[in-house]
Amino acid sequence: MNKLVNLTVLTSVAVLSACATMHKDSAAHLAVVEKITINAPAAKVWAKVADYGDLGAFHPAVAKTEIKSGTNNLKGAVRLLTLGDGGTVNETLTSYDAAGMSYSYIINESVLPVSHYSAKIDVNAISANVTEVVWNADFARKDSSATPAKGQDDAAATGTIHAVFKGGLDNLKKITE
C-alpha cells in the first residue's frame, strides 16, 4: 500500500513539475480589438482597405508593401511591409472575402514584439453613410520566457498592436470622411 501511495505522489509531483515548466516558458494568449466609426459609405472605406498588396494606402506607418509570393488578394499571398523606420513585417493572407469586406492574415516574421499572431480586419456598413471598421488580433509576446526582456512583456506586445491598429484606423477615418 505504501509503495502505491509513494508511486502516486511521485507521479503527481512529476506531472506538476512538467506543467509548471511548460507554463513558465510559454507566453500568455493576448488579444487586441480596435474599432472606429467612419462617416462614409462602407464601399468607400473598403476601397482603401481592400488591397492586401497596399497597406500603405491607409496606414501611415507603412512606407512600402510588396507581394513577395502568391497573388494579391488571394489566400496564401505573402506581403512584405517596410515600415517608415526601416523595420519589416512579413505576412500571409489566410482569407479574403471581398463581398463580406474582410480579410485575415498571420505574421510570419516581424520587428514587432509578438509571435503566433493572427488578425482580421472587417468593414461593416452601419447605415448608407456610416461604417464601422473592426481590426482584431490574437497573439503571444515574442519573448515567451517567465521574465521577458524590457519592452518584450505582455504590456509592450498589446500596447504595440493597439498603437498599430489605432494609427491605421485613425488615418483611414481621416482619408475617407
Which positions does each model-derived feature cover?
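Bacterial N-terminal signal peptides that target proteins for export
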Residues: M1-V9
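Bacterial N-terminal signal peptides
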Residues: T8-S17
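Hydrophobic ligand-binding cavity/cleft-lining segments
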Residues: C19-T71
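A conserved amphipathic terminal alpha-helix motif
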Residues: A20-T21, E132, D138-E177
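Hydrophobic/aromatic beta-strand elements that line small-molecule binding cavities or substrate pockets
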Residues: E34-I36, V89-S95, Y117-A125
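Soluble non-cytosolic domains of exported or imported proteins
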Residues: I36-A43, V49, G53, P113-V114, ...
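A mature extracytoplasmic/lumenal domain signature
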Residues: V49-D51, H59, D85, S95-D97, ...
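Glycine-rich portal/gate segments that line the openings of hydrophobic small-molecule binding cavities
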Residues: E66-P113, E132, G167-E177
